[in-house]
C-alpha cells in the first residue's frame, strides 16, 4: 500500500511540475539605496511572540543590508480592529501595515485611495511580477474587484509539499495496542468501525478494570481535531454542516445535501451507543489533550494534525521519533469506505497568506519601498523570514539551505521568534523545500518528505477531493451581505447539527423544514454569492 501511495504521489508531482512553473526570483543588488531611508510600520505579531521587531536580529541585519530602516509599532491583536478604524479615520497613516489588514479592510481602504495600488509599481518588483505570472492561484487571491493589488502575500509551499496541491489538515489515529490485545484489525469501513469501537468500549482494553475507555474522541469546534473528513467523508461529502463543498462545479454547504442526513444518522448511532466521547461536541483542545496525556490510555481513536499534541510524542511516534516502526501506541489509519462505496477526504487551499504587507498611498518614495518589499521574496530573505536568521537557525549550503532544529530543551516556536516575526512577505517554493534538509539536535539529517506530517499526508492524500473552494476575493457588496447573513446562519447550523448528532431530535424527519428555515435566513443568497465568485474565476 505504501509503495502504491508513493507511486501516486510521484505521478502527482510530475503532473504538478508540468502544470505550474516555478517563479523566477533573485537576490537584488544591495544596498537598495545609498542614502538611508526611514519608514514606519504597524504590525500584528504571532500569538506567542512577545518580542520587539525593532530588536529582532534578522530585521536589524536587513536594515544594515538594504539601507531601508523600519520603525515597528506592535499592535495587539485584541485591539487590531479598533486600531485599524481609528488610524484610517485620523488620516495619519503609517507607511506600512504588516499582518494587519484583511480583505475587507483592503477593499475598503484600497478602493478609497488610502492604500497604494502595488500593481502600479510592478516594474520595480521583478520577483513579485514573476510570482503573479507563474502562480495564477496567488494572483487570483490578491487581486481586488477593481483589478488592482493592494496587499503582498506570504507564500509558503512547505505546507503543501510535495506540491501536488493536496493540503491535509487532519489525520486519524487508533490505539494499536488495544487492537492487538483484542485481536482486531484496523477498520476500513463504517461497519467495521462500529465493531471496533464497541470492543474498545466493552472489553476493557486498557486493563485497569474500570470502564473509562473513550472509544472515539474529537473536538467539534477545533481545527485539525474535527471529524469533517473522517465521519462525513464515507457518505460522500465533507462536513460539518457549515463546510462549503464543491462538486461538479456546484457550490453547496454540507447540510444542504441529503448525504449529510445519512452521515448524521451514523454519528448519532455512535453517540447513542456511547462510542463517542461525551465531551466531543463541547470540549476545547486543552481538555482534549489532558485526557490524551493521561498515563493510562483512555482514547481508542482520536483526530489531530500529527498526534503528538494529543497523546505525546512517545505514544504518537515512539521513542525513535519515526512513524509506524513498531514502538508507538497509536498508528494512523486510512479514510473509511461508507455503505455506498464513498471514500473521500478533505482538501483545501493552503500556502497563501494574503495582505501580509500593505503600503499607505501617502508613503514617500513608493518606488523604493516597493523594491524593498520585493526583496523580501528573494530566496535567502524568505528562508530567514520563516525559519530564522543564518548562523543560528539556518545555514547556507552549496545546494541551498539547511534548517537547524531547535535544541531539545527549548520551545521551538519561541526560539525561532527571537530572530523574526515570521509575518512579512516571503516565497518558499516546492523546489526550495525539496532541497531544504533539517539538522536535528542529535545530529541526524532529515528531509521534509521524512517528516511525520508528510508521511501522514501520504495516507489520506490519494482520497482528497479534487474540487474545493479556492481563495477568492468577494466584492465589497458581497462582503457586506455575507457579514450580515452568515453568522446567525452558521450558529443555527451548528446548534441543530449538534442536537441531531447527540439525539436531540430526528434528523431525517426534521431536516427538510430546517433547510427551509435556513433559506428564509438567507442561506441560498450566501451560496449564490460564493457560486458567482467561483464562476468568475473560470
Describe every region a protein language model picked out.
Residues 1-4, 8:
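Positively charged n-region of N-terminal signal peptides that target proteins for export
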Residues 6, 19-195, 230, 239-246, ...:
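Conserved N-terminal structural module of periplasmic/extracytoplasmic solute-binding proteins
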Residues 9, 13-17:
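Hydrophobic core
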Residues 36-40, 66-71, 90-95, 113-116, ...:
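Loop/turn elements at helix/coil->beta-strand transitions in domains of secreted/extracellular proteins
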Residues 45-54, 158-173, 180-186, 220-276, ...:
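Extracytoplasmic/periplasmic substrate-binding proteins
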Residues 113-142, 197-201, 209-243, 299-323:
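Carboxylate/His-rich catalytic cores and anion/metal-binding grooves
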Residues 119, 148-149, 153-225, 244-295, ...:
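Helix-loop-helix "hinge/cap" segment bordering the ligand-binding cleft or interdomain interface
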Residues 375, 379-499:
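Conserved small-residue motifs centered on glycine
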Amino acid at each position: 500500500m505504501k509503495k502504491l501511495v508513493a507511486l501516486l504521489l510521484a505521478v502527482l508531482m510530475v503532473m504538478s511540475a508540468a502544470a505550474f512553473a516555478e517563479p523566477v526570483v533573485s537576490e537584488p543588488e544591495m544596498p537598495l539605496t545609498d542614502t538611508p531611508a526611514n519608514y514606519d510600520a504597524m504590525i500584528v505579531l504571532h500569538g506567542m511572540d512577545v518580542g520587539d521587531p525593532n530588536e529582532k536580529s534578522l530585521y536589524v541585519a536587513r536594515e544594515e543590508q538594504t539601507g531601508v530602516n523600519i520603525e515597528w509599532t506592535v499592535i495587539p491583536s485584541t485591539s487590531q480592529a479598533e486600531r485599524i478604524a481609528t488610524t484610517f479615520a485620523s488620516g495619519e497613516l503609517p507607511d506600512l501595515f504588516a499582518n494587519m489588514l484583511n480583505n475587507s479592510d483592503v477593499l475598503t481602504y484600497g478602493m478609497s485611495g488610502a492604500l497604494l495600488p502595488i500593481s502600479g509599481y510592478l516594474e520595480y518588483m521583478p520577483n513579485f511580477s514573476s510570482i503573479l505570472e507563474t502562480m495564477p492561484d496567488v494572483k487570483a487571491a490578491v487581486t481586488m474587484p477593481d483589478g488592482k493589488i493592494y496587499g503582498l502575500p506570504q507564500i509558503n509551499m512547505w505546507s503543501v509539499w510535495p506540491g501536488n496541491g493536496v493540503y491535509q489538515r487532519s489525520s486519524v489515529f487508533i490505539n494499536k495496542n488495544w487492537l492487538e490485545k483484542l485481536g482486531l484489525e484496523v477498520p476500513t469501513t463504517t461497519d467495521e468501525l462500529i465493531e471496533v469501537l464497541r470492543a474498545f468500549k466493552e472489553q476493557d482494553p486498557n486493563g485497569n478494570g474500570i470502564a473509562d475507555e473513550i472509544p472515539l474522541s474529537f473536538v467539534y469546534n477545533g481545527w485539525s481535531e474535527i471529524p469533517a473528513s473522517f465521519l462525513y467523508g464515507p457518505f460522500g461529502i465533507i462536513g460539518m454542516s457549515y463546510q462549503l463543498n464543491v462538486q461538479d462545479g456546484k457550490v453547496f454547504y454540507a447540510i444542504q445535501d441529503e448525504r449529510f442526513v445519512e452521515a448524521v444518522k451514523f454519528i448519532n448511532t455512535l453517540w447513542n451507543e456511547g462510542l463517542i466521547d461525551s465531551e466531543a461536541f463541547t470540549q476545547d483542545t486543552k481538555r482534549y489533550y489532558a485526557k490524551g496525556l493521561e498515563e493510562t490510555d483512555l482514547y481508542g481513536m482520536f483526530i489531530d494534525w500529527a498526534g503528538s499534541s494529543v497523546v505525546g510524542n512517545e505514544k504518537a511516534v515512539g521513542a525513535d521519533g519515526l512513524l509506524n516502526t513498531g514502538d508507538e501506541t497509536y498508528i494512523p489509519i486510512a479514510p473509511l469506505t461508507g455503505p455506498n462505496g464513498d471514500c473521500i477526504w478533505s482538501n483545501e487551499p493552503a500556502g497563501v497568506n494574503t495582505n501580509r504587507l500593505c503600503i499607505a498611498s501617502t508613503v514617500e518614495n513608493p518606488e523604493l519601498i516597493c523594491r524593498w518589499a520585493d526583496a523580501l521574496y528573494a530566496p535567502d530573505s524568505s528562508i530567514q523570514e520563516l525559519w530564522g536568521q543564518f548562523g543560528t537557525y539556518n545555514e547556507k549550503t552549496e545546494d541551498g539551505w539547511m534548517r537547524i532544529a531547535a535544541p531539545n530543551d527549548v520551545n521551538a516556536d519561541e526560539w525561532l521568534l527571537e530572530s523574526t516575526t515570521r509575518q512579512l512577505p516571503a516565497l518558499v517554493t516546492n523546489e526550495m523545500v525539496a532541497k531544504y534538509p533539517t539538522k536535528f539536535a542529535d545530529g541526524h539529517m532529515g528531509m521534509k518528505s521524512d517528516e511525520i506530517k508528510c508521511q501522514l499526508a501520504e495516507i489520506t492524500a490519494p482520497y482528497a477531493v479534487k474540487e474545493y473552494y479556492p481563495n477568492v476575493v468577494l466584492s465589497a457588496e458581497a462582503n457586506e451581505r455575507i457579514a450580515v447573513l452568515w453568522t446567525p446562519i452558521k450558529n443555527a447550523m451548528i446548534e441543530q447539527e449538534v442536537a441531531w448528532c447527540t439525539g436531540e431530535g430526528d434528523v431525517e424527519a426534521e431536516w427538510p423544514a430546517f433547510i427551509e428555515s435556513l433559506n428564509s435566513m438567507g442561506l441560498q443568497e450566501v451560496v449564490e454569492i460564493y457560486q458567482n465568485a467561483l464562476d468568475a474565476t473560470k
